[in-house]
Regions:
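Asp-based, Mg2+/Mn2+-dependent phosphohydrolase catalytic module
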Residues: 1-15, 36, 47-49, 53-55, ...
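Asp-based phosphoryl-transfer active-site loop
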Residues: 11-27
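Short beta->alpha transition motifs characteristic of CBS
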Residues: 25-31, 145
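Conserved phosphoryl-transfer catalytic core
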Residues: 30-44
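Conserved phosphate-coupling serine/threonine residues in phosphotransfer and NTP-handling enzymes
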Residues: 72-74
Length: 208
C-alpha cells in the first residue's frame, strides 16, 4: 500500500516485523518459558497480550509503507491463534514462518522485485532478528528488552515508536542523500538537537 504522502522520499519502504517479543509479550511480565514448556493455541491467547500501542502503530505503518510483513519462528498453530484473536492478520501482506529470517526476507524481496536497501527488519532477538538479517543485506533494529541489551544495535522502545523512527529516517534521507548523522528518536525532539550531546547516529549509512 502506497503512503498518502507521495512527495516524501522514504528511507524504508518494506518493513518486516517479528511476532513474539515484538508485537505481543507475556502478560504481567511472566517468563515466556512458562508457556513454551507446554504450548497450545488455547493457552497462547491467555498467556500473551499485545505490547503497548501495537494496533495504532500497525494502522499507521499500513498507510505509510509499501509492504508490511510478519516473519516468525512461532509454531503455526500458536501464531495463527494469536493473529486471529488480536485481529492482526489484516495488517500484513504476507506472514512468513520457519527458516532463517534473513534468507526468508531476501527471497521475498527478490520474488517481488524489491530492494534490500529499502527494507527494514524489526525484532527483539539478536540471534534471529538481527544478525541473520544483517548478514542477508537488510537493515535491522531491535525492540529494546532486558534480555538483548548486551548486543550493539539501533533500538526503539517498542513498535509504537516505529512510525516516528521511520519519519526521522525519511527526514534524514531528504537532508543527506549520501551520509547521514542525526539525533536519536528521543534526542531529535529535544530542545537543542544541534548540540554535541544531542547528536548520535540513528540511521545506518552505507559504507559508514
Amino acid at each position: 500500500m502506497n503512503p498518502k504522502d507521495g512527495t516524501r522520499t522514504r528511507r524504508f519502504k518494506h518493513v518486516f516485523l517479528d511476532a513474539e517479543g515484538t508485537l505481543y509479550v507475556p502478560r504481567n511480565g511472566m517468563s515466556r518459558w512458562y508457556f513454551w514448556a507446554r504450548p497450545t493455541p488455547e493457552d497462547a491467547i491467555r498467556f500473551f497480550e499485545l505490547d503497548k500501542g501495537v494496533i495504532a502503530a500497525l494502522e499507521k505503518l499500513r498507510s505509510e509503507v509499501d509492504t508490511l510483513c510478519l516473519v516468525s519462528l512461532n509454531s503455526e498453530p500458536v501464531l495463527d491463534a494469536i493473529l486471529d484473536h488480536f485481529d492482526l492478520r489484516r495488517f500484513f501482506d504476507e506472514v512468513m514462518v520457519n527458516g532463517n529470517k534473513g534468507d526468508r526476507i531476501a527471497r521475498y524481496l527478490k520474488e517481488h522485485g524489491f530492494s534490500k536497501a529499502d527494507s527494514l527488519m524489526v525484532g527483539d532477538t539478536p540471534g534471529l532478528d538481527l544478525y541473520p538479517v544483517v548478514k542477508a543485506g537488510v537493515h535491522s533494529i531491535l525492540i529494546d528488552r532486558d534480555y538483548n541489551r548486551g548486543h550493539a544495535a539501533e533500538r526503539i522502545k517498542g513498535v509504537y515508536e516505529l512510525p516516528a523512527w521511520l519519519r526521522v529516517a525519511d527526514i534524514a534521507e531528504n537532508m543527506f542523500k549520501e551520509r547521514v548523522r542525526i539525533a536519536t528518536l528521543d534526542e531529535f525532539f529535544c530542545g537543542d538537537a544541534r548540540t554535541v550531546n544531542c547528536t548520535k547516529s540513528l540511521i545506518a549509512v552505507s559504507g559508514a
